[in-house]
Amino acid sequence: AESEAGDASPLVTEVLIGSPPGYVGYTEGG
């Protein structure tokens, strides 16, 4: 996915911001 910050914990980032599985990791960046 578009790894920008939360690439190490995709599951955490997806739940935190609620981003789709395709954009997992990019969520942590904002």
Curated annotation (Swiss-Prot):
One of its GO terms (cellular component) is chloroplast. GO terms for molecular function: ATP binding. It is found in: Plastid, Chloroplast. Keywords: ATP-binding, Chaperone, Chloroplast, Nucleotide-binding, Plastid, Repeat. Signal peptide: none annotated. The keyword Transport does not apply. The keyword Chloroplast applies. Its main location: plastid. May interact with a ClpP-like protease involved in degradation of denatured proteins in the chloroplast. On the 2D-gel the determined pI of this protein (spot n9) is: 5.9, its MW is: 92 kDa. Belongs to the ClpA/ClpB family. This is ATP-dependent Clp protease ATP-binding subunit ClpA homolog. It comes from Pinus pinaster (Maritime pine). The lineage of its organism: Eukaryota, Viridiplantae, Streptophyta, Embryophyta, Tracheophyta.
